[in-house]
């Protein structure tokens, strides 16, 4: 079972201003306690070096550390888990490789994707999107919007599917209240944090919105 940390996830991204490590550090300083290292097309050795640094940072903050796509790397460094896209290793195969103690998340874009995934495996959470257009993702799937999430959540309830659904893709702070009202269990962010004038403050403000009862400490 995954922790309440999954309600707010940060996905690393490289920009002209910030390295992958910078982005993870700022998210952690802002109070986020779930970091997914996403380094598409990166050199394997560079990704491992980066993962080890960010994993140590996550441990210092008591945060969950997820590796995107790279199952063997997640196992090698004993990350908390792995997130798998629709074209990555099948979840069932990853579960065999990692065992039951690792968190495994899967990408879906529709309720049909959820049903197809559950035919062969049960992930710990679904990353579902995109909510809006996002420049951080290539080959973007059809945009869901609020109504798309409402429909998926309704269908999941009707089928008694109780797996956390995390909204992702172009999410900014102003959209969060209505997104949560749509029924998603959490959100994942990247660009909206990194494009802010003060990324740490932006994350801090969102953490306060998501976890009103939790005091944020550095």
Give the label of every model feature segment.
Residues 1-89, 97-124, 141, 147, ...:
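Conserved N-terminal beta1-alpha1 strand-loop-helix module at the mouth
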Residues 34-38, 127-135, 187-190:
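Short beta-strands and strand-loop turn motifs
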Residues 137-139:
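A short acidic, glycine-rich active-site loop
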């Amino acid at each position: 079972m995954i922790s309440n940390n999954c309600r707010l996830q940060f996905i690393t991204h490289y920009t002209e201003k910030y390295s992958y490590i910078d982005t993870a550090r700022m998210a952690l300083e802002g109070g986020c306690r779930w970091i997914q290292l996403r380094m598409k097309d990166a050199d394997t050795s560079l990704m491992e070096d980066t993962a080890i640094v960010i994993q140590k940072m996550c441990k210092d903050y008591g945060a969950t550390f997820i590796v995107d796509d790279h199952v063997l790397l997640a196992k090698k460094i004993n990350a908390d888990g792995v997130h798998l896209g629709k074209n990555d290793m099948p979840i069932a195969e990853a579960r065999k490789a990692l065992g039951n103690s690792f968190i495994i998340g899967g990408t879906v874009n529709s309720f049909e994707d959820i049903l197809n995934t559950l035919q062969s495996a049960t992930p710990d959470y679904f990353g579902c999107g995109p909510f809006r257009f996002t420049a951080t993702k290539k080959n973007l799937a059809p945009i869901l919007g609020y109504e798309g999430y409402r429909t998926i959540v309704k269908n999941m309830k009707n089928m008694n599917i109780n797996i956390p659904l995390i909204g992702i893709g172009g999410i900014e702070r102003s959209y969060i209240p209505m997104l949560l009202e749509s029924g998603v269990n959490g959100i994942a962010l990247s660009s909206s944090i990194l494009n802010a004038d003060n990324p740490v403050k932006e994350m801090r403000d969102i953490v306060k919105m998501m976890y009103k009862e939790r005091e944020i400490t550095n």
